[in-house]
Each structure stands twice: as C-alpha cells, then as structure tokens.
Amino acid sequence: MRRAVCPGSFDPVTNGHLDIIGRASRLFDEVIVGVLINQSKTGLFTVDERIDMLREVVRSYDNVRVESFRGLLVDFCHAQQASVLIKGLRAVSDFDYELQMAQMNIGLAGVETLFMPTNPLYSFLSSSLVKDVAKWGGDISAHVPEVVRGALLARLDPPSRR
C-alpha cells in the first residue's frame, strides 16, 4: 500500500491545504493528515478543534484520515508505515526551508518528500493571513471551508460584527 503523510499545524485548515490533500489522495492509496502538537506554540484553535474541522472537511475522501502527532515527523511517518511526506509549495521561499527539512528527513529515517506546487489560486494563502483578515472583519469565504469560516468568526468576533 502506498501511504503518505501530509503534515502541518492547520490552524486553521485552508482551501490551499485541502487542494494539496485532495491531489495527494489521487496519488496514494492512503493519506494521513498529521496535525502537529506543538506545546511551545499557542494556536488559535486547540489540536482537537483542528482535528474536528479537518475530519469534517476531508470526510468525502475515503482514503484520507486525520491524526495528531508530537515529536519528530519521521517517527510519526514510521508509526503510520508511511514512506512519503507531502509538502505544498507556494513560492520559492517555501522551497528553501522545505528542502532543508526534506534532506534531514531522508538522512534521519529514509522518508522521502514529494513537493507539490500549490494551485495558483492559493499561492498567497496561509493560515496566518486568513486569521488576520478574519480578525479585521474581511471576507474569508473564498479561502476556507464554511465550517472553518464559522469557527473563525465565532472565535475572533471581528470589529465589524460588534
């Protein structure tokens, strides 16, 4: 079975993330979306909330599941019996960082990285940008699934809604 891991913090998941996950699901028998538990960072959403949102938005994919992990990504890959990581690239600046990580992962544990260029519609999109726009009352409906939009608006209570 060809199994891959698509890792991230997904705080929150965006349509750019979903584009990569969906495309990966057509290339692999199984895709595990790995949600990083990073206790040194405080996210807007808890890990459980992120997992719930992800499970909601990927439920139409029979071969995608969502799990959390902490520690080394390559250890998570081995625990999931996945030999490939999927990483979306928005720009050359993403590549510089991700190439270093890919080389470390292959050196540490023989885990390969498949870089997928993002759809041009999402080349500018990041979770941080979505949160900033939502915080100030901007329309994020084209950038995140509806369940995420609702959760963001409820959590942030932008000034335009007060």
UniProtKB/Swiss-Prot annotation:
Is Transferase included in the keywords of this UniProt record?
yes
Q: In which pathway does it act?
A: Cofactor biosynthesis; coenzyme A biosynthesis; CoA from (R)-pantothenate: step 4/5
Keyword list, A-Z = ATP-binding, Coenzyme A biosynthesis, Cytoplasm, Magnesium, Nucleotide-binding, Nucleotidyltransferase, Transferase
Q: Which reaction is recorded as catalysed by this protein?
A: (R)-4'-phosphopantetheine + ATP + H(+) = 3'-dephospho-CoA + diphosphate
The record's listing under Gene3D superfamilies reads: HUPs
Localization, per the record, is:
Cytoplasm
Q: Where does ATP bind?
A: S9, F10, H17, G88, L89, R90, E98, Y122, S123, F124, L125, S126, S127, S128
Summarize where substrate binds, as residue positions.
S9, K41, L73, K87
* Domain of life (superkingdom): Bacteria
Per the record, the GO terms for biological process are: coenzyme A biosynthetic process
At the top of the EC hierarchy, this enzyme's class is: transferase
Tell me a GO cellular component: cytoplasm
Q: Which GO terms describe its molecular function?
A: ATP binding; pantetheine-phosphate adenylyltransferase activity
Q: Where is this site: Transition state stabilizer?
A: H17
Q: What is its EC number?
A: 2.7.7.3
Q: Which PANTHER family match?
A: PHOSPHOPANTETHEINE ADENYLYLTRANSFERASE (PTHR21342:SF1)
The record's note on quaternary structure and interaction partners says: Homohexamer.
Record family assignment:
Belongs to the bacterial CoaD family.
Which named protein is this?
Answer: Phosphopantetheine adenylyltransferase
Query: Which species?
Result: Salinispora tropica (strain ATCC BAA-916 / DSM 44818 / JCM 13857 / NBRC 105044 / CNB-440)
Gene encoding it? coaD
